[in-house]
Amino acid sequence: MPTLTAPPAVATPATGQWTATIAADRAYFEENAIEGVEFPAEAQERTVTLPAPQVRIGRRSTSKGTNPEIDLADTDPGVSHSHALLTLSVDGVWLVSDLGSTNGTYLNGEQQPLGAGHTRQLKGGDQVHVGAWTTITLHAP
């Protein structure tokens, strides 16, 4: 008699695809408080699949013609319209670059932001911090 298994309760990304969990991070917010900005009372965590080869992080703007793949327009006022870029290299490694953002791009709680135009290699579990409170955690397949 064949063994039957129940389908997964949550849809999973296709094999080999990285995902990113986007969340409001109170600890990051408190360390980098921006005057006049309050932590959101109701912030929804979400997970997205990273479409290769590039994923732009920022805030949508029709007047500026920006439409990032990770759009934080409705959630984090500290995120620039063109904030950061995730790029899948030819050898299968994800990289992050700051695009000259106003408030910087930070990795794994480091005190110094990634310089504008500088690139760093990422691995599963790394956290990219942007804006006033957003933390993007990368998950390897």
PLM region descriptions:
Residues 1-77, 134-141:
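Intrinsically disordered, low-complexity acidic Ser/Thr-rich regulatory segments
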Residues 20, 45-132:
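Forkhead-associated
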